[in-house]
């Protein structure tokens, strides 16, 4: 192996980006098939293949960072910029949903009965399950910060406890959201209210599942001694993402659940 006289990571050719793109196409096509033809075969194939790509891509990144030492301070700086830009792009993604919601609700058209919520829509009570979900996500924000401080202080046992608690709260939120969807008196097909509500809260729910998965990988790595007090960017990125999910939920709760009802 040739001597490397710089601190940059020269990445080896990887099949995962193109395979990841193919599984994303399969999953989104499967979603369309499910919505229009009530068939989940393609969606299941897409999700399973995406899971396989995720596991193998994560394995490669873990090997490059933990075992080969490619994630030097210079590389970590680049990864931090990348994560910040990714979260910024996600913020603009949600901005589009909020824009659609306020565009429709601030000046309701005659088709909606000139009112918001539209005629015939019975909105969810913001002081019931949505308020509990808000408390759960805020509590998970506290526990993930507790885990972060425990890692930086070298207290591995406490970090494992805090991170496990965060993941359990994340899955509890997802279960409550699924229950709320099941019991809602309106659907995604019920006017622009149903469309904006389910698309915005559904995409947020998807982000909670992604964040919970990200934190689960971090927990497994923490158990296997992959993180040190000064080298744990994988966890840091997951924590940033989780705080972003928390903040988006607060905006969703205040606008769609509380003000929108």
Swiss-Prot record:
It is an enzyme of class 7 (translocase). The chain crosses the membrane at residues 16-34, 41-66, 73-105, 129-152, 156-183, 191-223, 233-256. The keyword Magnesium does not apply. One of its GO terms (cellular component) is respiratory chain complex IV. Residues 1-15, 67-72, 153-155, 224-232 are mitochondrial matrix. Keywords: Membrane, Mitochondrion, Mitochondrion inner membrane, Translocase, Transmembrane, Transmembrane helix. It comes from the Eukaryota. The keyword Transmembrane helix applies. InterPro entries: Cyt_c/ubiquinol_Oxase_su3, Cyt_c_oxase_su3_dom, Cyt_c_oxidase-like_su3, Cyt_c_oxidase_su3-like_sf, Cyt_c_oxidase_su3_a-hlx. Its EC number is 7.1.1.9. It catalyses: 4 Fe(II)-[cytochrome c] + O2 + 8 H(+)(in) = 4 Fe(III)-[cytochrome c] + 2 H2O + 4 H(+)(out). One of its GO terms (biological process) is mitochondrial electron transport, cytochrome c to oxygen. One of its GO terms (molecular function) is cytochrome-c oxidase activity. Gene3D superfamilies: 1.10.287.70, Cytochrome c oxidase, subunit III, four-helix bundle. It holds the Pfam family COX3. It is found in: Mitochondrion inner membrane. Residues 35-40, 106-128, 184-190, 257-261 are mitochondrial intermembrane. It is a multi-pass membrane protein. Component of the cytochrome c oxidase, the last enzyme in the mitochondrial electron transport chain which drives oxidative phosphorylation. The respiratory chain contains 3 multisubunit complexes succinate dehydrogenase (complex II, CII), ubiquinol-cytochrome c oxidoreductase (cytochrome b-c1 complex, complex III, CIII) and cytochrome c oxidase (complex IV, CIV), that cooperate to transfer electrons derived from NADH and succinate to molecular oxygen, creating an electrochemical gradient over the inner membrane that drives transmembrane transport and the ATP synthase. Component of the cytochrome c oxidase (complex IV, CIV), a multisubunit enzyme composed of 14 subunits. The complex is composed of a catalytic core of 3 subunits MT-CO1, MT-CO2 and MT-CO3, encoded in the mitochondrial DNA, and 11 supernumerary subunits COX4I, COX5A, COX5B, COX6A, COX6B, COX6C, COX7A, COX7B, COX7C, COX8 and NDUFA4, which are encoded in the nuclear genome. Belongs to the cytochrome c oxidase subunit 3 family. This is Cytochrome c oxidase subunit 3.
């Amino acid at each position: 192996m040739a001597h490397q006289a710089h601190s940059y990571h020269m990445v080896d050719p990887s099949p995962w980006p193109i395979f990841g793109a193919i599984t994303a196409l399969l999953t989104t096509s499967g979603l369309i098939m499910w919505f229009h033809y009530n068939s989940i075969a393609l969606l299941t194939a897409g999700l399973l293949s995406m899971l396989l790509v995720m596991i193998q891509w994560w394995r490669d990144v873990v090997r490059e960072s933990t075992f080969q030492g490619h994630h030097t301070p210079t590389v970590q700086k680049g990864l931090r910029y990348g994560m910040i830009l990714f979260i910024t792009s996600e913020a603009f993604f949600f901005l589009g949903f909020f824009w659609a919601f306020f565009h429709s609700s601030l000046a309701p058209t005659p088709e909606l009965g000139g009112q918001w919520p539209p005629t015939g829509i019975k909105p969810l009570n913001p002081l019931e399950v949505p308020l509990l979900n808000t408390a759960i996500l805020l509590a998970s924000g506290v526990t993930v910060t507790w885990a972060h401080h425990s890692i930086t202080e070298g207290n591995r046992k406490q970090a494992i406890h805090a991170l496990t608690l965060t993941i359990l709260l994340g899955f509890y939120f997802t279960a409550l959201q699924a229950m709320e969807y099941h019991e809602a008196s309106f659907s995604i097909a019920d006017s622009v209210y149903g469309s904006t509500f389910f698309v915005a809260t559904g995409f947020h729910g998807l982000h909670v599942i992604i964040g919970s998965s990200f934190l689960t990988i971090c927990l497994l790595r923490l158990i296997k001694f992959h993180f040190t007090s000064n080298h744990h960017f994988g966890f840091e990125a997951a924590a940033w993402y989780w705080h972003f999910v928390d903040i988006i939920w607060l905006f969703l709760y205040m606008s769609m659940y509380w003000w929108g009802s």
